């Protein structure tokens, strides 16, 4: 069995999608029309460093991931058994599963990016060396009540999210802990997957009412629940994803329990491939 995984914010880089925009000219033109700017120029030239601003990052990654997927299935003539995406990448997983078309997905991520960009002064940091329980305990002990766990990327790679000054304070405290191997501030423009996204979630929920989705043709593993999407709760799950933790470790563990599973990352970079390698390694090391 094979699962295709789609990356989210943090995987963007100048030059991504090179070659794809000309190959899929019709969809590229469609994207330009929806966005009101050239997606090719944004990805290849990165004017005003816009690629690192969430309102641009999200549509850019969605388009590049989608075109990468279309090229892959056209060239290889194979469809995956399962799909999953990290945060923004989940929209590409739903697109691959034919829950909505390219255009609908782009309209959704454009709105998602716009709403998330309105909430400023946030930050995120990855804490390496501690598991989710240990990070939660440390946040409590250090009275960092305004910091949330945003992503469980691997058993010992936990991302925290909150106001910029609180994240800086948290990072300094985590660095003093002997078990912590590294604290890495993330190059993001907001406190994603935290309570600070509640307003964005509410507005996005309203926006979703206008759209029609189809039942997924391939199981899509949800970040929020680490199990397949159900059609009835699709819109609710997408809205919840904005202010809930990304359960990436649990999602990959769920897929690994299905039997012999191969994973292929579709889109720019290999961040998810590295995380999956870590999850597998830690699963092997854990006592049964």
Curated annotation (Swiss-Prot):
UniProt keyword Cell inner membrane present: no
Signal peptide (UniProt feature, chain positions): none
Which Gene3D superfamilies does this entry report, sorted A to Z?
Malonyl-CoA ACP transacylase, ACP-binding, Malonyl-Coenzyme A Acyl Carrier Protein, domain 2
According to the UniProt record, what class of enzyme is this? transferase
The EC designation for this entry is: 2.3.1.39
* Main location per the UniProt record: cytoplasm
**Catalysed transformations (reactions):** holo-[ACP] + malonyl-CoA = malonyl-[ACP] + CoA
| Gene Ontology cellular component annotations, sorted alphabetically | cytosol
According to its UniProt record, which residues of this chain constitute the active site?
Answer: 87, 193
Q: Which InterPro entries match?
A: Ac_transferase_dom_sf, Acyl_transferase_dom, Acyl_Trfase/lysoPLipase, Mal-CoA-ACP_Trans/PKS_FabD, Malonyl_CoA-ACP_transAc, Malonyl_CoA-ACP_transAc_FabD, Malonyl_transacylase_ACP-bd
Family recorded in the similarity comment: Belongs to the FabD family.
The protein's matches in PANTHER family, at most eight in alphabetical order, are given as: MALONYL-COA-ACYL CARRIER PROTEIN TRANSACYLASE, MITOCHONDRIAL
**Role:** Involved in some intermediate steps for the synthesis of the antibiotic polyketide bacillaene which is involved in secondary metabolism. It catalyzes the transfer of the malonyl-CoA group to the acyl-carrier-protein AcpK (Mal-AcpK).
| NCBIfam families for the chain | fabD (TIGR00128)
Name-wise, this protein is Polyketide biosynthesis malonyl CoA-acyl carrier protein transacylase PksC
